[in-house]
Every structure is written in structure tokens, then in C-alpha cells.
A protein has these predicted regions:
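The start of beta-strands in P-loop NTPase/AAA+ ATPase cores
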Residues: 2-4, 111-112
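Alpha-helical substrate-recognition element adjacent to the catalytic core
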Residues: 3-88
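Structural alpha-beta junctions
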Residues: 53-56, 86-96, 126-130
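Conserved beta-strand termini and adjacent loop/short-helix elements that scaffold enzyme active sites
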Residues: 62, 99-102, 130-132
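Surface-exposed, flexible loop/turn segments at secondary-structure boundaries
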Residues: 67, 105, 135
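Donor nucleotide-activated moiety binding/catalytic core segment of transferases
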Residues: 92-112
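Acidic, Mg2+-coordinating phosphoryl-transfer loop and its flanking beta/alpha structural elements
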Residues: 112-142
Length: 142
């Protein structure tokens, strides 16, 4: 079974919908990463991911820290993203969670299926890649 990978910001977490998200990130405030609303219904997503895990798939996270963030801020962003996952997808046992510096090539971390809102990441991925639209429909096809 292939690995399934999820980006977070703009894919499952609505970072860009948080009021004043960009000024807060520039001020190295990690709050928007925790405050981001889910971009889809988390209960059905968690249920589907757990079904796929039971069938032998691995479910993983590959997400970037903030662009231009200091090392300390990037550590805070990692913690904020882990907190977001614990709040919204606590029942999912992720095999791997990589929260890496902004711009790190995601294809260095895995293969299989990627859900990511950034076209560049989808194009360079080693496997099948989908955008953030219709995630549940794509998962149901597996």
C-alpha cells in the first residue's frame, strides 16, 4: 500500500483564513498556526484515515515552517502545528510527521500520494499528487 502524505497550510488547515495571519507570521507569532480552522470536516477525515491505516496505508504529514523564520520561531511553529494536529486529528496515528524549513523539497521525504495546495510541490513529488480540492473523494477511491 502506498504512503499518503498531507501538507497542512492551505490543504487541511486554513492558515490563510486567519485574520492578520501574514503580519503575525512576520512578527514571528505562531498563533495563526493553532488558530487555523480546518478546511474540511475533521471527523469524517479522521474516520477515513483510520480505515485506510487499518487496510495497510501509512498516513503522514509533510509541512513547512514559516518563510524566513528564525530557528526559535520555526521550533515554535513546529509545536503549534503538532498542537493543531492533536486538536483536530487526535485519533489518527501518523506514521511520520515532518515539519521542515520553508522550501525544503518535500519529495525528499517520501513517495506515494501527496495532498498539497502548492503546484510546485505536486509537480516535483515522487508519486501521485492532488491539490487540496476533493480530498475526501480521492481518499474514497483508494
Amino acid at each position: 500500500m502506498p504512503d499518503i502524505w498531507f501538507d497542512m497550510d492551505g490543504t487541511i488547515a486554513d492558515l490563510y483564513g486567519v485574520e492578520n495571519w501574514l503580519p503575525m507570521l512576520r512578527a514571528e507569532n505562531p498563533a495563526p498556526y493553532v488558530a487555523a480552522a480546518p478546511l474540511l470536516k475533521m471527523q469524517p477525515l479522521a474516520r477515513k484515515l483510520n480505515q485506510l491505516i487499518a487496510r495497510g496505508y501509512t498516513v503522514n504529514i509533510i509541512s513547512w515552517t514559516s518563510r524566513g523564520g528564525s530557528e526559535n520561531y520555526n521550533n515554535e511553529v513546529r509545536e503549534a502545528k503538532l498542537k493543531w494536529l492533536k486538536i483536530h486529528l487526535s485519533s489518527v496515528q501518523f506514521s511520520e510527521i515532518h515539519i521542515v524549513p520553508y522550501g525544503t523539497p518535500k519529495e525528499n521525504f517520501g513517495t506515494g500520494i501527496l495532498f498539497d495546495d502548492e503546484q510546485k510541490n505536486r509537480e516535483s513529488w515522487n508519486g501521485i499528487a492532488f491539490d487540496e480540492k476533493n480530498i475526501m473523494e480521492k481518499l474514497r477511491e483508494l
